Amino acid sequence: MTELILFDLDGTLTDSAPGITRCVQYALTYLGKPRYEPEELNCFLGPPLKEQFMKFAGLTEEEADTAVEQYRERYNGIGIYENEVYEGIPELLEFLKKHGKKLGVASSKPQVYVEEILRHFGLEKRFDVIVGSELDGT
């Protein structure tokens, strides 16, 4: 039987905190919310954006939709590239592939972003399966 090893993207393969927290701050500033230190926004690493905007900043559903739009406005051209692959990850993936393991990425981040980040860092060919959410959060 072939083994499949799944990895998350954010916080596992890449340190995406700088790009995510800067985009969150951009969205909150757009809505006239206070400025937060990047460390205060680390709670946005992982969970779905809309729900986290509502929980963290007390936004209404409509405001959270606007926050997500603003987040993505900055993320699409800038924030997506404000991250880096953790040290040793390329070597680990290569080792696992050489030992016959199937590798996959499963992320709550939209699939188009997952694929672009993996492409940007030259990692996409190391994965047999890449799964992310849709832009609408499904």
What residue ranges belong to the model's regions?
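Short alpha-helical
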Residues: 19, 48-51, 91, 112-113
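Metal-dependent phosphoesterase signature
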Residues: 54-91
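Hydrophobic "anchor" residues on beta-strands that sit immediately upstream
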Residues: 4, 104, 129
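Substrate-recognition "cap/lid" segment bordering the active-site pocket of phosphatases
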Residues: 111-138
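Short, acidic loop-to-helix structural element flanking the phosphoryl-transfer center
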Residues: 77-105, 111-116
